[in-house]
């Protein structure tokens, strides 16, 4: 007997290829629930009312911090590792994220040696980007809103003998300083749409030369699939997921004195990310 989740995945497989490509925004949330959880669509009014009551008392920042300090840390730490304790959807997300990280590393390598250059990685997670950049010789300042994530990144770096990377706990708005390069990868999905331009502006204020940012783009089919995901309540619905208008991001970069130099789209079955590299002009 198929569960509601299995039925949904079966339906996804029959969609047009462009519809199958999905961002972390919707199906990822369902896929990351414990495998033993039973999902069934709830009445729209019940789901909406419950969500409204929760969101009126818990702001985005608190929600994200609590999630990634608790059950979210355990799930995503497995995804961002070589652990075999992941399902096919989680493995697909891992592959997509790894592709984004590799593209950034390739771009930076193509621009020459970064040994001694300063890099600020905002929303560093477990160090997926910060650690390889440190191995390339960059001086790393990496932060995450989650103590658990930042500590895990620091432990991984220490185990590798890395000494040129500092990891600490901070939200995006509180990050200060000046750096050659500022990165913010797969973080904007947790950031409110109406504050996106302001956040991009802040990241730019930290960068002397370059900003790299990725986000889940706002398109009609991702909006549709996000709505489908919202029909499935339960423990997996832990944080709000935001899709962003690419033009808003580009306008914010331009306003801050940056110009997009390179861009890339990474898409797998359950991961979709738009990556922009902007340089100061």
Labelled PLM ranges:
Residues 1-18, 52:
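Short, Lys/Arg-enriched N-terminal segments with co-localized hydrophobic residues
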Residues 183:
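A conserved beta-strand element that flanks and buttresses the S-adenosyl-L-methionine
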Residues 186-190:
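Short catalytic micro-motifs in class I SAM-dependent methyltransferases
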Residues 59-112, 126-176, 197-198, 202, ...:
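Class I (Rossmann-like) S-adenosyl-L-methionine-dependent methyltransferase catalytic domain
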Residues 38, 53-57:
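N-terminal mitochondrial targeting presequences
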Residues 8, 20-43:
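N-terminal chloroplast transit peptides
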Residues 115-123:
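Conserved class I S-adenosyl-L-methionine
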Residues 206-210:
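Short glycine-dipeptide loop
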